[in-house]
Amino acid sequence: MQVLPPGSTGGPSRLFILRPVATTLLMAAILLAGIIGYRFLPVAALPEVDYPTIQVVTLYPGASPDVMTSAVTAPLERQFGQMSGLKQMSSQSSGGASVVTLQFQLTLPLDVAEQEVQAAINAATNLLPSDLPNPPIYSKVNPADPPIMTLAVTSNAMPMTQVEDMVETRVAQKISQVSGVGLVTLAGGQRPAVRVKLNAQAVAALGLTSETVRTAITGANVNSAKGSLDGPERAVTLSANDQMQSADEYRRLIIAYQNGAPVRLGDVATVEQGAENSWLGAWANQAPAIVMNVQRQPGANIIATADSIRQMLPQLTESLPKSVKVTVLSDRTTNIRASVRDTQFELMLAIALVVMIIYLFLRNIPATIIPGVAVPLSLIGTFAVMVFLDFSINNLTLMALTIATGFVVDDAIVVIENISRYIEKGEKPLAAALKGAGEIGFTIISLTFSLIAVLIPLLFMGDIVGRLFREFAVTLAVAILISAVVSLTLTPMMCARMLSQQSLRKQNRFSRACERMFDRVIASYGRGLAKVLNHPWLTLSVAFATLLLSVMLWIVIPKGFFPVQDNGIIQGTLQAPQSSSYASMAQRQRQVAERILQDPAVQSLTTFVGVDGANSTLNSTRLQINLKPLDARDDRVQQVISRLQTAVATIPGVALYLQPTQDLTIDTQVSRTQYQFSLQATTLDALSHWVPKLQNALQSLPQLSEVSSDWQDRGLAAWVNVDRDSASRLGISMADVDNALYNAFGQRLISTIYTQANQYRVVLEHNTASTPGLAALETIRLTSRDGGTVPLSAIARIEQRFAPLSINHLDQFPITTFSFNVPEGYSLDDAVQAILDTEKTLALPADITTQFQGSTLAFQAALGSTVWLIVAAVVAMYIVLGVLYESFIHPITILSTLPTAGVGALLALIIAGSELDIIAIIGIILLIGIVKKNAIMMIDFALAAEREQGMSPRDAIFQACLLRFRPILMTTLAALLGALPLMLSTGVGAELRRPLGIAMVGGLLVSQVLTLFTTPVIYLLFDRLSLYVKSRFPRHKEEA
């Protein structure tokens, strides 16, 4: 048994050093738990931080935006506004469609929100129009969230109406049942229907009206209960031929008698099988298609959901005819998986670089193996905790583990270096392990808890940004904590068994060359440090200048919210003049699609024209452009967008707005551009006065580009001004007028055909082919009191006016949203400030309010809390260090290193042309935890030298700096190399990772050079200050 020297108790590590088998088994258990946990971790792009969001869609074909607002949207809004936990309610009322989007507080479960929405819809039912074709339909989905998967269904042999019927009954329903799917929408609008196109002249010639025809059809097609007969022995169910299923049956329907002769529907109308809405269409790569957009529920796992759909697709497509082709046009999980793979590669590269730097410094294979074991053990063990906390493998958690690579190795390096130093002095390995581990134990605890303290403020960040980085902070904190445990248990135990004087002294030519190099570097550092200590005020001036420079750089650096990712999918809106018809929009989309598909980076394209729950107005076309994989194209997404907009710019009468899809979706409405600013008033008249003024002012700002608004009040409208007195004299009511107009021009759904698989509509309208435009109104006839027919022109005057194409509300009040992008050379912070200055210049009245929306609002909130976040991190670390050192002074000395990290990070971001965004700020906060390690290692040894060896403060700090120079350099380089793969990343999702790497590498480079000299000087300054205070207040000294 070895005789241990006095003081070599080993501290908390003693038990683990002396019991190697128990220590090994304990570490094996941590490793096994991590491996098992990894298999159960889901994969995602980012942590699940979606607001609980529900979309309520109500379709009322033929209704104007005014009618939709007053008759549908307003009653629903009044009921929704009473729900608890509602964060924001926005609505959009357009011709025939009302879409209300409800965003709830993050703390409210989605299922609870769903129950409240259903109850509110039920309460509003009696207030909605009685002839509403379908009740409001709600979906647990955020409309601004891009589809997780887009599929196109095409056929060269079958009409699109049959294709849609098959897709709706055989495919869409099954996909909707997949766990995690929130909504499956079919773009293209080709639901089968029987269309009845009345010949107005033929109807009038027979003395009939459209209302006569409608009544006849609705009475002839019914499907109601008829009862049953219950006899003494048998029961008989009653049924009848009350249903008409085909266009031929409707064509033969007798609608009236003239002079004893039957008038059949086919005599006055064209009856045919067609689509329910003839003003809807979708195309995939210019071919007519039914496009299925699959959106996930907020909070659902996107990878698991997409995998379930793909597993189901072969079975579903087998049930379709051979001529029907189903193509997956886009799958967001492809890029998510690629991004996660790239991040995993960078994690492995970081581990390899860190192990390499360890070997370079230690030049000993056994000594390199020890931290080489500690790093993967700490990282893998973290997976077990992540499973317990319901985390996922995503870009942020993998970034945390990549950064943790440099952190977790620090503890092991510090322990190994200290134990090796005693072995090289002649101590036995076991005694050296006990003594070295006991001596360094407090330093490891200080490093660990002070670093975790930096992360604590991240856990208390509010709103969606706080939720986003909670997984990052907790994952990193867990890895650091496990690393500390490993460094105080397994590392010293392995040192006691694997290190020896022979192994440490065994050197080859490379080792000796490295040793000579390190000796020269340390000697040079010692000479430089001696000069610096002799000129403290010059050094303090440099430290103070660094502080001022960090503040200046913070003010001038461009600031942003979240890096714009290249996910390979572009969402777009094609805008045309407000009076554009469906036919003209279909022609325009063909021209635009042709230009877009010619671009070498484009893989596929889907376009949609018409009004439904996804598209609000007829003069806009929705596009989704799917790009080739990143390694198969030369340009990033922003370059492709610029090229496409240039190509389309020469097409007259259209404006194309494009933006790349992002993994983080904060908006609740589909926007034309990345950022939004809203103008809200109590009335539409107030908005109409101020919107043009503000839009002109915003368009003149150089900090903004592609400025547009959703205010569209120049749509053509025909105002039917009825002479109520004349109408009353003829026995014609306003309801008669509305019904006649609705029958003629509203694609009115007048009856339902029920089948075993689905339900289909009978659509009534006038055949306006021979009388287009306003002339069609002259064909309208109404039934008077005496049974005769009266032309509409006899009781009404037709006026052409302008009317809004859509009416938007936010929390029940009218609102207009301005969309904008930020041009190259400016930051989002510049744009926000320019908008605020413009608002002040315009001097808006008190009843007009403005607000940033979506990601711009989140940016404002994040920017406002950033300074407080950093202050909170510093205060938290000061408190922890003060408790550990039982001193008010030493924590200040340690924290004095922070400005150097800030200067380095900000300079690196500016040089790299990167904005100070949320990711970069997280990097700066992490630097706070890393950089202070240097000071802790210096001060710990200086205090020990003063206390145990009686050295003067100057000699103690000088010796501590030289003794700890090598581990400081080693740990800093390890952290730097851990961040280097992130800084140099170029794969999918690199935009997200790069700012963190740039900030950390820049901060570490600058701080490493400066803190090695400024920390000793500041230590001595505060020591003299402490002596001065004690001399002026001797009572404190006596009490001490």
From Swiss-Prot:
Transmembrane segments: 25-45, 347-367, 369-389, 396-416, 440-460, 472-492, 537-557, 863-883, 888-908, 910-930, 968-988, 998-1018
Gene Ontology cellular component list: plasma membrane
Cellular localisation: Cell inner membrane
InterPro entries cross-referenced by the UniProt entry: AcrB_DN_DC_subdom (IPR027463), Acrflvin-R (IPR001036), Multidrug-R_MdtB (IPR022831)
Keywords, alphabetical: Cell inner membrane, Cell membrane, Membrane, Transmembrane, Transmembrane helix, Transport
Topology of this chain in the membrane: Multi-pass membrane protein
Major place of residence: membrane
GO molecular function annotation: xenobiotic transmembrane transporter activity
Pfam families (UniProt xref): ACR_tran (PF00873)
Entry keyword annotation includes Repeat: no
UniProt xrefs under PANTHER family: MULTIDRUG RESISTANCE PROTEIN MDTB, PTHR32063
Record's subunit section: Part of a tripartite efflux system composed of MdtA, MdtB and MdtC. MdtB forms a heteromultimer with MdtC.
Family: Belongs to the resistance-nodulation-cell division (RND) (TC 2.A.6) family. MdtB subfamily.
Name this polypeptide is given: Multidrug resistance protein MdtB
Species: Salmonella choleraesuis (strain SC-B67)
